[in-house]
Every structure is written in C-alpha cells, then in structure tokens.
C-alpha cells in the first residue's frame, strides 16, 4: 500500500476552492467492501474459455474474505483493498465429460500490481488428468487477471465521485487519467463503401462505411462484450458507462465516444446513435451491428451512416483498432488455440 504523502500524482488535487479545512488534514472515508464483494463475484462468474478440447467456466465463488475502502486526505485519494479469494471451476470436454477444479487468489491487494497478483489453478481431489487444466491455466488465468484489473479500475472510478471538490482554478480533476482515443493509422480489412455526401443532423457532408470481421466466439458472447460495462472497459482499457436497453445512454474511451442504444436484439443486432467528441455538436451517426453465426464463429457486420465526410478514415480506423482488434486481443477471439 502506498505511504502517506506518496502515490500516483494523478490522484493529487490542489487546495479546495471552498477553503474548507485547507490547512488541516481532513479525512473522508468510503467503505467499498460490499460493492467490491458483488463486483468481484460478477466479474469472476463471467469468466469462460473454450478451445478444441472443450470449455471451462468459473461456477462458484466459495471464499471472498477481505475489505476495501477509499480515503481522501487533503486532496489525496488513498485506496486500500485486500482480498483472499477461492473459486470453483467446471470443465466440459468435447465428449461431454465434466471435471471440477479450484482457483486460489491469495494476494489481491493494493500492495500488488495486477501482474503481481497470484492466481493458481488446480483440479479437485480425485479428478483424473485433463488437458482442460492447461486451458484454464493459460486462457482462464488471463481472463481472471483481466477481471482483477477491471475491479481495480472501477473501484477507482465509481467510488471517487464526490470525494474531491473543485480546485482553486474551478476545474475538477480526472481521477483516472486514461488516454483519449488516438488517431494512429491502421489498415482496415474492408474496402470503403462510400455513399454520396449528403446533409444530416447539423447539415454537414456525410458518408457511409461498412466493415466485416470474424470473431472466434459465439454471437451470444460477442453480444455480451458490446453490452456489458465491465467487458467494454476491459477491451477499451478505459472507464465506460452504459445502459444496454433501448434509449439507454453510453459513454466510453474517456468520454471521447458517446451515444444511445436505439434497438437491441440479443445475439442478433445492435443499433445505436454514436459520435466522437470532436464531431460537430449535436451530430450523431447511426451505427448498426449485425451478428451472424458461422458454426462456432461470428461474423460481425458493422454499418455506419451519417459519418462526417472528413472523419471517414478516422472512424474506420477507430472501429478497426479500438473495437475489433481490442476485443480480439483482450478476449482471445482472434486466433485458434491448439
């Protein structure tokens, strides 16, 4: 745990604008233990991995001992969390044989980075050997570690609200300091599909783009990735908030992407109003995602209408890099496992 007066400068704020207790140490403490318990259970129980040997999933959280809290001392946020965790997992081979096992995480604490958290996987007593253990130790542990990272990230975003007041210059401090969406170039797989420029929304020239990508997962799982807050935060590596219902709002990638869901059909279709922060005020594109089952794989068809014409290539690159490649790298949906 960080020492008093030390820590990440992103969490340090200036003297308070209201001058309250400016020259004294002032404590504000928030207990995050109950929230952490539910958040960790949700994240761990969502872990599922699969390859040609079969599939594995976390089925039970049978021990979750510890506590979490946040302290604000004169503008410095100090996070404390310490957990000992035991999970049960079940593996099912392609032939239908089931295996039981355990996961132990003895040192999830603020004193360890995500990479330093120990995660051990084992078979239950008297279970025969199976190659599914290797699947769980490699891909399962990867997703468990990502779940730990999401927990830490959301702890530092959801529970800091209201704990730091505006600074003397009237500005608030961004407690996370995540990078904004960048505009590096990358080669998209699909060729441009332009429509004739036409005015829409706030009368600007617009165009249409289409992209197709194949993911090595089911439509059900890929749909969850786009509609579950924790999973969106995982593949964007930044805070996000979303309500996956018709009319539900979303914002992600440090507020650079915002919008509203207009239609959702689980495992089949998502339609949304969508915009970059840099676009003209009030202008949204219409994005449609169609999920097509391809015998264990999913073909995702993305169509974007009303894209500002000067933003066509940036939007295409953003979807290819931050959505498609981000999802594949985070969840392992881009390459077969042998």
From Swiss-Prot:
Instruction: Extract the CDD domains matched here.
Output: SRPBCC_Aha1
Name the principal localization, coarsely classed.
Answer: cytoplasm
Which Pfam families does this chain map to? Aha1_N, AHSA1
Phosphoserine modifications at: 193
BP-aspect Gene Ontology terms: maintenance of unfolded protein; protein folding
Q: What causes induction of this gene?
A: By heat shock and treatment with the HSP90 inhibitor 17-demethoxygeldanamycin (17AAG).
Question: Which Gene3D superfamilies is this protein grouped with?
Answer: 3.30.530.20, Activator of Hsp90 ATPase Aha1, N-terminal domain
- Cross-link Glycyl lysine isopeptide (Lys-Gly) (interchain with G-Cter in SUMO1) lies at 182
**GO cellular component annotations, sorted alphabetically?**
cytoplasm; cytosol; endoplasmic reticulum
Q: Which domain of life is it from?
A: Eukaryota
Q: Name one GO molecular function term.
A: Hsp90 protein binding
Q: How is it modified after translation?
A: Phosphorylation at Tyr-223 enhances binding to chaperone HSP90AA1.
Keywords per UniProt: Acetylation, Chaperone, Cytoplasm, Endoplasmic reticulum, Isopeptide bond, Phosphoprotein, Stress response, Ubl conjugation
Any idea where this protein resides? Cytoplasm, Cytosol; Endoplasmic reticulum
Where does cross-link Glycyl lysine isopeptide (Lys-Gly) (interchain with G-Cter in SUMO2) occur?
203
- For the modification N6-acetyllysine, the affected residues are 3, 212
InterPro entries recorded: Aha1, AHSA1-like_N, ASHA1/2-like_C, START-like_dom_sf
Instruction: List modified residues, type Phosphotyrosine.
Output: 223
Q: Which family does it belong to?
A: Belongs to the AHA1 family.
Query: Its quaternary structure?
Result: Interacts with HSPCA/HSP90. Interacts with HSP90AA1; the interaction activates HSP90AA1 ATPase activity. Interacts with HSP90AB1. Interacts with GCH1. Interacts with SRPK1. Interacts with FLCN.
Q: What does this gene product do?
A: Acts as a co-chaperone of HSP90AA1. Activates the ATPase activity of HSP90AA1 leading to increase in its chaperone activity. Competes with the inhibitory co-chaperone FNIP1 for binding to HSP90AA1, thereby providing a reciprocal regulatory mechanism for chaperoning of client proteins. Competes with the inhibitory co-chaperone TSC1 for binding to HSP90AA1, thereby providing a reciprocal regulatory mechanism for chaperoning of client proteins.
Protein's name in the database: Activator of 90 kDa heat shock protein ATPase homolog 1
Give the organism, scientific name. Answer: Mus musculus
Question: Source organism lineage?
Answer: Eukaryota, Metazoa, Chordata, Craniata, Vertebrata
